[in-house]
Design a protein with these regions (language model features):
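Cytosolic-facing regulatory segments adjacent to core modules
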Residues: 1-79, 93, 189-192, 202
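Acidic, glycine-rich A-domain
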Residues: 33-34, 101, 105, 224
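Phosphate-binding/switch region of NTP-binding enzymes
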Residues: 38, 102-214
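Hydrophobic "anchor" residues on beta-strands that sit immediately upstream
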Residues: 82
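Conserved Walker B
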Residues: 88
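Catalytic P-loop NTPase motifs of RecA-like helicase/translocase cores
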Residues: 91-92, 130
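Conserved ATPase-coupling elements of RecA-like P-loop NTPase cores
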Residues: 92-99
Length: 224
C-alpha cells in the first residue's frame, strides 16, 4: 500500500474475513479485545486451510522504483503471484510533466513487470475530479484519474457505481460495472456494500432495478 499502514490493512482484512465490525478491531473507544481475538483466530484458520499469506510492505512506499523492487522481492523470495497496489495515483516518478504522463508511465511499467514475472496485479485507482463530482452519472473507465492510460494497460476494469448507490442503515445497494473485459463481455454486477465489515457481496437486483434494465415486468411477460 502507498497509503495505509500495516495495522490499518490488517484490521480491514480481519473485518472482511470475519464479518466483525472494523471499529471493534481498531484501537479506539469501540475496540473489543474479544472481537479481535475471534477475528484473529478465524484469519489464522483460513491461512492454515489455504496455505496462503498476505504480505504487506514494512515501510511506506512512494517511488515507482521502490514499488517495482517490492513486487519483485515478494515474487522472488516468497513466490507471490497476486499483487494489489493501493493506489496508482500515489506512485511518484521523476521528470513527469503532468499527472497523465506520470500515470501513463506507472501503468506501462507495472504492466511490463506483471508480464515478465507472470503475476496478476490489481491496481486501485481514483476517479478524476469531474467523474467524482458527477455523483448522478454512471462512471466509465475514461473517468479514471490520469486519463486512458490505466484502461489501456488493463485486461479488465471494474468500477464502483456511485450513481446507483442506495444506502439502508449500515449497508448500501449498488453495482460493480465491468466496463472493460478482454476475456469476454461487459456486465453490471449487483452488489451490497457493508460499511461495518467492509464486505462487498453479490445480491439479487430488485424488481425496480430489473425493470430499469429490461423493461417493465408483468405476470405473463415483459412490457416495453
Amino acid at each position: 500500500s502507498l497509503e495505509m499502514g500495516r495495522s490499518e490493512l490488517a484490521t480491514r482484512l480481519m473485518a472482511i474475513t470475519s464479518g466483525f465490525p472494523v471499529v471493534e478491531l481498531e484501537q479506539g473507544p469501540s475496540f473489543k479485545q474479544d472481537t479481535f481475538e475471534r477475528a484473529r483466530r478465524q484469519l489464522d484458520a483460513i491461512r492454515e486451510l489455504s496455505g496462503g499469506h498476505v504480505l504487506v510492505n514494512r515501510r511506506p512506499l512512494s517511488k515507482l522504483s521502490d514499488l517495482i523492487a517490492c513486487i519483485k522481492y515478494y515474487h522472488e523470495v516468497h513466490g507471490s503471484k497476486y499483487v494489489v497496489v493501493d493506489y496508482l495515483q500515489l506512485a511518484w516518478t521523476a521528470n513527469s510533466q503532468s499527472i497523465h504522463d506520470r500515470i501513463e508511465l506507472v501503468a506501462h511499467q507495472l504492466r511490463d513487470l506483471t508480464h515478465s514475472l507472470g503475476i496478476t496485479l490489481v491496481a486501485l485507482s481514483q476517479f478524476n475530479r469531474q467523474t467524482s463530482a458527477a455523483r448522478s452519472e454512471r462512471p466509465t473507465a475514461q473517468g479514471l484519474m490520469g486519463g486512458s492510460a490505466v484502461e489501456n494497460d488493463s485486461h479488465q476494469v471494474l468500477l464502483f457505481d456511485h450513481s446507483r448507490f442506495t444506502r439502508m442503515g449500515h449497508t448500501a445497494d449498488t453495482w460493480l460495472i465491468l466496463d472493460k473485459n478482454r476475456h469476454g463481455g461487459v456486465v453490471d454486477i449487483p452488489v451490497k456494500w457493508d460499511f461495518q465489515n467492509l464486505r462487498i457481496s453479490p445480491r439479487s437486483p430488485t424488481i425496480e432495478e430489473q425493470e430499469q434494465q429490461h423493461g417493465r415486468l408483468t405476470r405473463v411477460g415483459r412490457m416495453r
